[in-house]
Amino acid sequence: MARLVLCALALLVAGGLADPVRNNVPQKPADPVFAKRQMDLMTLFFHVLEPNYIEANKVIVNTWSLEKNIEHFSNVTAVTTYIKMLENQCCVPRAVPFSILEDEHKFEVVTLFNVLHSAKDYDTFYKTAVYVRDRVNPDLFSYVLSAVIVNRPDTKGIYIPRVFEIFPSYFNNGEIMTTAARINTHGDRLVDFYPSTYKWDKNVVIRWNPHLALLQQPEHTYSLLHSRLQPQLILLQRSLSLPGWLQTEALPVNQHRRGEWFWFLHKQLIARYYMERLSNGLGEIPELGHETVKDGTTRSFGTTMEFSSPVRPNNFNLDQPEFVNEVEQIYDYERRVRDAIDQGYVLNHLGERIDISAPEAIEILGRVIEANVDSPNVQYYKDFISVWKKVLGNSLVHEHQYFHHYIPLVVPSVLEHYQTALRDPAFYMIWKRVLGLFQQWQEKLPHYKPEELAMPQVAIEKVDVDKLVTYFEYSYMNVTSGLPMNVEEAKELYDQVSVLVQHPRLNHKKFQVRVNVKTEVAKTVLVKFFLAPKYDSHGHEIPLHVNSYNFMQLDEFVYDLPQGESVITRDSVETTGNEWTTSYQVWDQAEKASREKHLSAKNMYFQDVLIYHKHTLNPCSHVE
């Protein structure tokens, strides 16, 4: 068992990544108008593979016209473009998988986002969303609508159903989804017939049963930790609040330091993963070379279109004829970034030099490596990370294409979906390599001076941490929205059978951190807790200057230190936040708020986005 070190650091309230954190997110009054918007938008996500069943929405679908309402949009170009795309049927078909990494798919994403985001009022936005829901690819629609809700001021605070509630097939194997389909057909009358199901209150529960393929590879002894929902969903949330294809000017809510957050989030993920590997005896994260990838993955899933996602065998050979161009692209694009780091500057699209030799330049470097639209030169510093994902996902071959061979048919791998990428060990191999670029840049920065780090009036005397006790417990995922409604259900707009899937999750008992501090004068400080391994996989102590990149930030909070001796206490429940709210709970709350003005609804979705680097990346987080 690897030993971990907990560090406490007291700093003045300034700098770093402190400002996006919100320990106490203010409540948004849930007036009837807001509550109705919440309910209306939630209905667009539920049973998204099926047509609109709500009568009012049917009227909109049949009568609303983009052409006749074009004056209600600020981005007329996007609207006219999308009208032509719909007329000429050059959108991603509803019956094929969607991949945000495909340029043709991404073009429709950006166009539809600009249409919905540029609606001048909420009514136009909502009617347009209803209108396109039944006309476009459901995965694409759900992704775009989520991104718009996050970034429109008049939908701020709207809760977005979790992706596992919308598309449960991404998170459950074929056996589970087949059993769920049988329950959906037979109701609860055959529960006793299936050994994997039982009745719980008004729900039918499917017992957890991992696919036997997970036992075929040593890496999959870690399957429970790879499959944890929360980090996967946070990666998706980041892509919605700060999508790489959306310029900062169009982000009224989430436009702070996207390049730096890009680095920070993935550094947290890799640091956490490394500690979990050490704790489970899996050793170092393998290096990603240019010949063979030892660890394969059998983590396929049934897509919403009943395609099975590609898998990667063990000892996957990159030296294959079909990968030659892609591998050359990867090394060429990586070399351009390495050259820029060595030279101390990047070139913008005009050929002008932009200095990256200062610590603040991590924002520029992050944008360059992500190759997002705010990069100084996206035509030169290209997206090699996505190419890695396509190659290692083993999903490069497009056998059929649509709309005169313009739109490719690609069945994305686990790596190519934000909500599933962390299940593949190749994700961490890619990001170990990418973080090496950031580390190469950081090593060229000037060293901190003692006066920049020291707080001579504050001394940390001692840090005590309670014993950490972990255990597994079950959580329950509602998959009902992914099951088709029968005629009566569609008429009544109510699911007669609620199907839950049992999943194990790692939890821990409550513990406390105590920091004994001596202060010469009263001072307000920012306290940060970090967790890091003390020994590597060979049992050797890791030198601090080498280990710094393995430090994972657990928590940060503002604290008023009194003069003299004091003890800062922090409970684990303060670090991790509350249980995620389910869509059922939000719907019930919104329904009540639509009738009673005195109720209030928390700004739930934005709370998740703004504090994700605290609780979601904790390797022992009790939230799942």
Curated annotation (Swiss-Prot):
Q: By its UniProt entry, which InterPro entries does this protein fall under?
A: Di-copper_centre_dom_sf, Hemocyanin/hexamerin, Hemocyanin/hexamerin_mid_dom, Hemocyanin_C, Hemocyanin_C_sf, Hemocyanin_N, Hemocyanin_N_sf, Ig_E-set
Q: Which UniProt keywords apply?
A: Glycoprotein, Secreted, Signal, Storage protein
Record has Secreted as a keyword? yes
What is known about its induction? Suppressed by juvenile hormone.
Q: What is its main location?
A: secreted
Q: Which PROSITE patterns match?
A: HEMOCYANIN_2
Q: Which Gene3D superfamilies match?
A: Di-copper center containing domain from catechol oxidase (1.10.1280.10), Hemocyanin, C-terminal domain (2.60.40.1520), Hemocyanin, N-terminal domain (1.20.1370.10)
Quick one: signal sequence residues? Answer: 1-18
Q: Which GO terms describe its cellular component?
A: extracellular region
What GO MF terms are annotated?
nutrient reservoir activity
Tell me the compartments it is located in. Answer: Secreted, Extracellular space
Entry protein name = Acidic juvenile hormone-suppressible protein 1
Taxonomic lineage: Eukaryota, Metazoa, Ecdysozoa, Arthropoda, Hexapoda
Q: Which gene encodes it?
A: AJSP-1
